[in-house]
A protein has these predicted regions:
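N-terminal glycine-rich FAD/FM-binding segment characteristic of electron-transfer flavoproteins
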Residues: 1-283
């Protein structure tokens, strides 16, 4: 069995800042982390590998510094890491990103074996679109299961998988055939911690590095800014809004009934009583 997990290096949202003039995210000096939802996807993949055998390949698209996140994924137990990096990818929106990643997954299948499962996090904390995973599935003609919280059962012999999917008002149990793309929510599994030996192994590991050409990307105009129909015009922090509030004083006496309390409130704010009466008449 071969599983591919797409991860992304993102700024630590707890320390992110917005430039006061340009209203853009200031990334300089901000530490980076693996997107948290991608860690849930990685843990799900590693547990399936531990139970059923096979290999887990982690894939990321980004600048050379994204190698740090790949090595961390190797520390957690991934078998292989692929870095997709090229200046042509700069400025990619979700459409261009899914195009490049889908091409890389196709290439991974040719070189290392076709994956039965592709995992992504449900979304990234810097973009929050939740579009890249489904975009990859569409381009790869894969069935997709989104917002999955638990892998309930994997039947490799039968070529099918059963999952629990979080839905409004409850949980759905879904079963589908392989191959499939799954986007993961936070689940019931705790993320493993790599040992010192794992970290040393990851530090020595070879990172497979591909350019757009290496990944077999045919149309470079579909990559980066040129292949991105959406552009972020502005990022800004909302201005604090002063809330208008009225302070009322309640007499420090025992209030036995709700009517007594309302009498004190409405006696202090007669206008409020009038508004409530009018609202009641309207209803």
């Amino acid at each position: 069995m071969h599983i591919v997990v797409c991860i992304k290096q993102v700024p630590d949202s707890a320390q992110i800042r917005v430039h006061p003039v340009t209203n853009t995210i200031m990334r300089q000096g901000v530490p980076t982390i693996i997107n948290p939802y991608d860690l849930f996807a990685l843990e799900a993949a590693l547990r399936l590998r531990d139970e059923h055998g096979g290999e887990v390949t982690v894939l990321t698209m980004g600048p050379p510094m994204a190698e740090d996140s790949l090595r961390k994924a190797l520390t957690f137990g991934a078998d292989r890491a692929v870095l997709l990096t090229d200046r042509f990818f700069a400025g990619s929106d979700t459409l261009a990103t899914s195009y490049a990643l889908a091409a890389a997954i196709e290439k991974i299948g040719e070189v290392f074996g076709k994956p039965e499962i592709v995992f992504t996090g449900k979304q990234t904390i810097d973009g929050d679109t939740a579009q890249v995973g489904p975009g990859i599935a569409k381009r790869q003609s894969l069935l997709q299961l989104t917002y999955v919280s638990k892998i309930a059962e994997l039947d490799l012999a039968g070529g099918k998988i059963k999952v629990e999917r979080r839905a409004e008002g409850g949980v759905q149990v879904l079963e589908t055939k392989l191959p499939v793309l799954i986007t993961m929510l936070e689940g019931t599994n705790d993320m493993r911690r790599g040992s010192m030996a794992d970290a040393l192994r990851a530090a020595r590991a070879e990172i497979v590095t591909w350019s757009a050409k290496d990944a077999g990307i045919e149309d470079i105009l579909k990559c980066g800014l040129r292949g991105s129909p959406t552009v972020v015009k502005r990022v800004f922090a909302p201005s604090p809004r002063a809330e208008k509030a009225k302070q009322i004083e309640i007499q420090p006496v025992a209030i036995d009934t709700a009517d007594a309390l309302l009498e004190q409130i409405f006696g202090t704010l007669p206008a409020l009583e009038t508004e409530l009466v009018e609202l009641h008449q309207t209803l």
